Curated annotation (Swiss-Prot):
<feature type="glycosylation site" description="N-linked (GlcNAc...) asparagine">
    <location>
        <position position="295"/>
    </location>
</feature>
<dbReference type="GO" id="GO:0030182">
    <property type="term" value="P:neuron differentiation"/>
</dbReference>
<dbReference type="GO" id="GO:0005125">
    <property type="term" value="F:cytokine activity"/>
</dbReference>
<keyword id="KW-0964">Secreted</keyword>
<protein>
    <recommendedName>
        <fullName>Protein Wnt-2</fullName>
    </recommendedName>
</protein>
<keyword id="KW-0325">Glycoprotein</keyword>
<dbReference type="InterPro" id="IPR009140">
    <property type="entry name" value="Wnt2"/>
</dbReference>
<dbReference type="InterPro" id="IPR018161">
    <property type="entry name" value="Wnt_CS"/>
</dbReference>
<feature type="disulfide bond">
    <location>
        <begin position="76"/>
        <end position="87"/>
    </location>
</feature>
<feature type="disulfide bond">
    <location>
        <begin position="208"/>
        <end position="215"/>
    </location>
</feature>
<feature type="disulfide bond">
    <location>
        <begin position="206"/>
        <end position="220"/>
    </location>
</feature>
<feature type="disulfide bond">
    <location>
        <begin position="331"/>
        <end position="332"/>
    </location>
</feature>
<feature type="disulfide bond">
    <location>
        <begin position="137"/>
        <end position="157"/>
    </location>
</feature>
<keyword id="KW-1015">Disulfide bond</keyword>
<keyword id="KW-0732">Signal</keyword>
<keyword id="KW-0272">Extracellular matrix</keyword>
<comment type="function">
    <text>Ligand for members of the frizzled family of seven transmembrane receptors. Probable developmental protein. May be a signaling molecule which affects the development of discrete regions of tissues. Is likely to signal over only few cell diameters.</text>
</comment>
Amino acid sequence: MNAPLGGIWLWLPLLLTWLSPEVSSSWWYMRATGGSSRVMCDNVPGLVSRQRQLCHRNPDVMRAIGLGVAEWTAECQHQFRQHRWNCNTLDRDHSLFGRVLLRSSRESAFVYAISSAGVVFAITRACSQGELKSCSCDPKKKGSSRDNKGTFDWGGCSDNIDYGIKFARAFVDAKERQGKDARALMNLHNNRAGRKAVKRFLKQECKCHGVSGSCTLRTCWLAMADFRKTGDYLWKKYSGAIQVVMNQDGTGFTVANKRFKKPTKNDLVYFENSPDYCIRDRDAGSLGTAGRVCNLTSRGMDSCEVMCCGRGYDTSRVTRMTKCECKFHWCCAVRCQDCLEALDVHTCKAPKSADWAAPT
């Protein structure tokens, strides 16, 4: 009763959807999916009909979103680089992060926010670079206007962030809008907070025209800030995320602790406390911290005491090539020697229990 090989590939997306944890944003897997737009749209597991429809109609936008996935996951990993959970991704899992996001935790709140922000950023940038058929520069930024420095003319290419937000809302929120449960409402709230974060750092840039740079005339445009600003802002929101519970009629949230203020549209919200991420735990989706590099002199989250959860650490001596004895040569170059540097690297010990290395 061996199935033909072609039949196995035909059913593989369905099997992945059935066997994998139910995480709403399976579109994250678009990072790893290549080929034609039809192959991509039909073989990313878990997309709802509205998402597939948008995917088929806008293959150029989907390419931009797919490229953006790598960017926002890298930003997530940068923000969590010194923490026990370091936003690690699983290449073989269509949810990208595995079971860790099944919990309605602070980490889930951050990932949904940064991913939604990443879609806005990727689409808006692609619009300005002329890569999309459906949008270009912001058409509303025309003619003259005023600011606190006087009159200026709109020129150049203003980032069309309203289009990016509109498409991101339609595509990213599509699955959550089909459900009325608490997790769907949590995801929608954090998705919106992520989109708003990108727009928060839209800035006006100007170029002066006139004799000797006198700036008698100014041409201005709106541009998104580097995505790092959005990541830093959402990290602060993660640190101050508000724990909530559903209200009695199931239409919104109320704070879990009455001493805290009601969350705004810019805040991140979560329902469940996070696991400690110390040990590998299949159910929690935690990979643990065994083998993670720690900082012996730090007192923060990256310290060996905190990162290793009190288990201790191993120290190894390694060498690396660095630039040294750099000298400035007129004009205008800096020349350096290549030197070998020896340093100690500290890594967290594994738990003593025999089952810590069980695969997740």
